[in-house]
Amino acid sequence: MYPLTSDIASITSTQNPLVKQLRQLHQTKGRKQQGQLLLEGTHLLEVALAQGKGFNHGCFTAMWQEKNPVLADRLMAQSVHSYLVSGEVLAKMASTVNPDGVVATLTMDQFWRSPPPHARLGLVLERLQDPGNLGTILRTAAATGVEGIWLTADCVDPTSPKVLRSSAGSSLLLPQQQLQSLPPLLEKFHTQGLQLIATVPQATQTLWEIDFQRPTIVIFGSEGQGLSAPVLELTTHQVAIPQAPQVESLNVAIAVGVMLYEARRQQWAASTPG
C-alpha cells in the first residue's frame, strides 16, 4: 500500500511540469519512457482500486472530490503523490474531451501480468490495429472467463487510453503478455495438448462442432489481413462462423465474442447438473 499523502498539493497552472508529464502518457513512446500509464475517469479508478493497485500520481478536481469523498480518500491513501487540480489542468492532463474529474498513473509492472501456464481458455491476438476493437475484445474476454491473453508487439498498445476506456476497465483484470513472435508460444501449446482454434471463412468445419470443454486457445488476426501463414499452419482447427451469404465478414471483436461465448456456453453446460 502506498503511504497517505499528508499535505495534498494544488496545481492551477496548465504550465506545471506534471501536466506535460501526464500528457506524454497519451502516446506509446511516453508510456514506455516513463514506465507508467494513465487511468482516466471514476470507473477505471474504481476497478484499479478494487484490484489493490497503487498509483504514482492521483489528480482530481474539488468538484470530483466533493462528489466522491470516500473514493478520493482511497485514491490519496493509495497514491505516492496526490494533487488537487483545477478543471482546466485536469482537462489538459486527460486525453478525453470531457473528463469527469480524476486521473491517476499506474506503473507498467502492475498492468502486465503473465498468463497462467496451463489456461483452460486463452486468447491470442496477432497484428490487431483498432483500439476500440481491442478494448471490446478485452471486455468480452473478461466476461467469458478467459484466463490469459497473448498479443504480438505489433498489436495496438493495450495500455493506450482508448483501449483502457473501451475495455471499461476489463484490461486491468486480465493477465496479458506481449510477444515479438507467436510460433514459439503456439509450439509450446502443442506440447501441452491444447487445441488451437482459428476462424477461416472458407473452412468446412463450424465453431459449433468444436469441443470447447478441452483446454483451448482461440487465435485471431488483424482486421484486414487476418492471421499470418506461419500462425495458421500451427493451428489444430480452422473453423467458420456461419452467417448469411450476403454478409462478407464479421467485425473481429464480434467474431471473438461469438467464439468465446460458444466456449463459455459449452463449459457452463458441462458444469451444470442435469
Curated annotation (Swiss-Prot):
GO terms for cellular component: cytoplasm. Its EC number is 2.1.1.-. The keyword Nucleotide-binding does not apply. InterPro entries: Alpha/beta_knot_MTases, MRM3-like_sub_bind, Ribosomal_eL30-like_sf, rRNA_Methyltransferase, SpoU_MeTrfase, SpoU_subst-bd, tRNA_m1G_MTases_N. Belongs to the class IV-like SAM-binding methyltransferase superfamily. RNA methyltransferase TrmH family. The lineage of its organism: Bacteria, Bacillati, Cyanobacteriota, Cyanophyceae, Synechococcales. This is Uncharacterized tRNA/rRNA methyltransferase slr1673. Keywords: Methyltransferase, Transferase. GO terms for biological process: methylation; RNA processing. Pfam families: MRM3-like_sub_bind, SpoU_methylase. One of its GO terms (molecular function) is RNA methyltransferase activity.
